[in-house]
A protein has these predicted regions:
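A Zn2+-metalloprotease active-site environment signal
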Residues: 3-259
Length: 259
């Protein structure tokens, strides 16, 4: 599946900032941003928020530097700032078992305390946050929601074309066709592209903010060690394997540093 622009017209097709990869956006960004704000509030109610104000302030400080670097970059480039409608917010979730961080559409960011064992320092934290913010800058959530819409339409067309055979198979096997296609062959390769794109953009954002992006390689080495024996085969994963990720990042570091 391509980006789907030919099927839905140029108004639904745009490009990712910096990489200029074509992407499909059928869902209004403002709609996802509003939904993200609501969900973020629910997360804050449900999860235990850390009382470590020092670390939270560090996260906010790093985030602020990345925010400003992104805005300044696009201003210098005479390009629209993709974060102009973001309402940035940061939380630190107390959960040592979860080694994760994320950024919702619109700049709603969370870091789990378990991730701090992987990041180790400011450079590492900036690398992780730069990556997560890159997902939001590249509008990956909008893109994935749009492709989900496209996939649902395609499945309905397939069901009509097969006179209900697809639905009959689903009822017999209990298998969700959309779910299966989302896991293998259609959605995952695209998701891996998004992850690699966020790796690349994240390096740029962290570097522009004054951080040593060489720490990114060490992060993924530590993550690989933490996930030893647990990491799924890349084909069935939405993320590139740690080894491939390290190789890609290593090859990009000099290029990004020189920009």
């Amino acid at each position: 599946m391509g980006c789907g622009c030919a099927s839905f017209g140029l108004h639904a097709c745009t490009s990712v900032p910096i990489t200029e990869r074509k992407q499909l956006r059928l869902i209004p960004e403002a709609k996802l941003n509003a939904q993200a704000e609501q969900l973020y509030e629910k997360v804050k109610e449900k999860e235990k928020l850390s009382k470590d104000i020092t670390t939270l302030n560090k996260i906010k400080n790093i985030g602020s530097k990345i925010e400003n670097s992104i805005t300044e970059y696009f201003a210098r480039s005479n390009q629209p700032d993709p974060t102009v409608n973001f309402r940035w917010e940061y939380i630190l979730i107390e959960n040592k078992k979860v080694k994760n961080a994320w950024c919702m559409p619109g700049g709603k960011i969370a870091v789990y305390t378990g991730m701090l064992d992987i990041t180790k320092n400011d450079n590492g934290l900036a690398a992780v946050m730069g990556h997560e913010i890159a997902h939001a800058v590249a509008k990956h959530s909008v893109e994935r929601a749009s492709r989900g819409t496209l996939l649902n339409v395609g499945t309905k067309i397939l069901d009509i074309a097969t006179k209900g055979a697809v639905s009959n198979v689903n009822r017999t096997t209990g298998m969700d066709t959309v779910g299966l296609l989302s896991q293998i062959g259609i959605m995952n390769p695209f998701n891996r592209k998004q992850e690699s794109e966020a790796d690349y953009l994240g390096l740029i954002f962290a570097s522009l903010s004054g951080y040593d992006i060489r720490e990114t390689v060490k992060i993924w080495e530590r993550m690989r060690e933490a996930n030893k024996g647990k990491e799924p085969a890349e084909f069935m994963s939405t993320h590139p394997s740690s080894t491939n990720r390290i190789n890609n990042i290593t090859s990009w570091i000099n290029e990004v540093t020189l920009e």
